[in-house]
């Protein structure tokens, strides 16, 4: 069973005679985490080697500075191959956003799907400037490439160190399907019937869509 989901269907004019229509066939998994540091509460005027804020700040800095290794999903590679062929360029995986700058905002989306990502987004600690809190918490938005969920969590655990732990606030699977079948053929045929320069290409989505829900029902979802 197949479905057409909520993202995709937009085009990129890469040459006068070629427009790429992006069809989502995969998307990253989601891991929203609370990073928690426990320490010793006390007065702000005292020395405190067990400061929860200090421990959390170090962990957040390590995660923010970490350079995640490239993990090129087949859908991502198919998209990159199509763009390389269309533009006559060689895309450098270390500077993909610069290589694809002429594609506009799509370049950032492609850059985000070259690897797992983890962005600290929220901080919570203390209630008064002269009181050292016993706990500090940060919110983290993590996204992992299909097939690399275990690597994502192992890396986060290592970066947190001994004094910080994580709790999962929200977790959703990564989704993928092959760019093939009768529906894909029909998409290409319909596009070319309306646009002679059209070519459908697969891509990997950095965010989350209804494809996650459909996949749990055994439905292949294209965006």
What are these regions (language model features)?
Residues 1-9:
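A glycine-rich helix N-cap at a beta->alpha junction
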Residues 8-223:
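Metal-dependent amide/peptide-bond hydrolase catalytic core
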């Amino acid at each position: 069973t197949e479905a057409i989901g909520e993202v995709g269907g937009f085009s990129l004019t890469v040459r006068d005679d070629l427009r790429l229509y992006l069809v989502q066939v995969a998307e990253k998994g989601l891991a929203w985490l609370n990073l928690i540091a426990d320490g010793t509460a006390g007065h702000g005027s005292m020395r405190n080697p067990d400061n929860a804020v200090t421990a959390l700040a170090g962990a957040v800095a390590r995660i923010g500075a970490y350079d995640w290794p490239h993990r090129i999903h087949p859908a991502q590679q198919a998209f990159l191959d199509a763009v390389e062929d269309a533009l006559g360029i060689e895309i450098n995986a270390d500077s993909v956003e610069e290589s694809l700058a002429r594609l506009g905002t799509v370049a950032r989306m492609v850059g985000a799907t070259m690897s797992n990502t983890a962005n600290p987004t929220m901080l919570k600690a203390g209630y008064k400037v002269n009181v050292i809190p016993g706990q500090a918490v940060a919110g983290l938005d993590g996204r992992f490439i299909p097939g690399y969920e275990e690597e994502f969590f192992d890396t986060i655990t290592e970066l947190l160190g001994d004094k910080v732990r994580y709790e999962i606030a929200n977790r959703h699977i990564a989704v993928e399907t092959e760019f093939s079948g009768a529906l894909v053929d029909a998409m290409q045929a319909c596009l070319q019937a309306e646009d002679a320069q059209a070519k459908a290409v697969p891509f990997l989505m950095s965010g989350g869509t209804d494809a996650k829900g459909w996949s749990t029902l055994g439905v292949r979802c294209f965006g």
